[in-house]
Curated annotation (Swiss-Prot):
InterPro entries: CAP/MinC_C, MinC, MinC_C_sf, MinC_N, Septum_form_inhib_MinC_C. The keyword Manganese does not apply. Cell division inhibitor that blocks the formation of polar Z ring septums. Rapidly oscillates between the poles of the cell to destabilize FtsZ filaments that have formed before they mature into polar Z rings. Prevents FtsZ polymerization. HAMAP family: MinC. The keyword DNA repair does not apply. The gene is minC. Belongs to the MinC family. This is Probable septum site-determining protein MinC. SUPFAM superfamilies: Cell-division inhibitor MinC, C-terminal domain. Keywords: Cell cycle, Cell division, Septation. Interacts with MinD and FtsZ. It comes from Burkholderia multivorans (strain ATCC 17616 / 249). NCBIfam families: minC.
Length: 257
């Protein structure tokens, strides 16, 4: 087989970011009910996102109908692309989904957060043909050097979305249905009534700062909280900072004087 470089395409080993849907039970009725409950408050949040089904948390001897789980995820508008399984879980290929390898970007939490669901995107690797060119070295920065802070000084209305490769500063209101996303920190010097997602590539040190917190959803590194879990009175509508501590969102009053 010739490895001569083609001017028309490249085929190489690589990695892509995707969500992991970790299955912890074989009770598909309970799983379906919980999935619907989680998504009914924010049906658009994961719409069209790719997801890998992770069955490594199942006990020895347990198995699930992956075709049914695949359909469940499709029903909430997610796109299953593969399965992550242990070597002993040979049944995981029965649904026709490819087996993938996953490298979690953080150690697994000892206990799930009471008010947030971890959905951080690990790197999922798919094997490919030998590359004609070298691939990036492991540990290389995933974000270009010298990324500048993005400043938005206009109101964001329902349906609008802003994405920042680094930090994001917003100087005007974020309305219901609007979404602001950053790979770094988010600063909002106005009311936040839409969705704010910081550290979206797994940056657990990212924070959200806001002078008036009234959000539909807040998220750091994929750990999120929605309006189905009302905010305490001491932070609702107030100046706050939001950070992660042991897989839990901490929302703290921000005293500016």
């Amino acid at each position: 087989m010739s490895l001569k470089k083609s001017p028309f395409f490249e085929l190489r080993s690589g990695s892509v970011d995707t969500l992991l849907f970790t299955v912890k039970t074989t009770d598909l009725d309970a799983l379906r009910a919980e999935l619907v409950k989680r998504f009914e408050a924010t049906p658009e949040f994961f719409a069209d996102d790719v997801v890998a089904i992770d069955v490594r948390r199942l006990a020895d001897g347990e198995r699930v109908a992956l075709a049914d789980i695949r359909q469940m995820l499709s029903d909430v508008r997610m796109r299953p692309v593969g399965v992550v399984a242990l070597a002993t879980q040979g049944w995981a290929t029965e649904a026709g989904l490819p087996l993938l390898e996953a490298r979690d970007r953080r150690a697994p939490a000892a206990k799930a957060a009471d008010e947030a669901e971890p959905v951080a995107a690990p790197a999922v690797e798919a094997a490919a043909a030998p590359a004609a060119e070298p691939t990036p070295e492991p540990g290389a920065a995933s974000q270009p050097a010298g990324v500048q802070t993005l400043v938005i000084d206009r109101p964001l209305r329902s349906g609008q979305q802003i994405y920042a490769k680094g930090d994001l500063v917003v100087l005007a209101p974020v309305s219901h249905g609007a979404e602001i996303i950053a790979e770094g920190n988010i600063h909002i010097y106005a009311p936040l009534r839409g969705r704010a997602l910081a550290g979206v590539h797994g940056n657990h040190d990212a924070r959200i700062f806001c002078t008036c917190l009234e959000p539909e959803l807040i998220s750091i590194a994929g750990i999120y909280r929605t309006t189905e879990n009302p905010l305490p009175a001491d932070v609702l509508g107030k100046s706050v900072q939001i950070r992660l501590e042991e897989e839990k969102l901490m929302i703290e009053p921000l005293r500016l004087t």
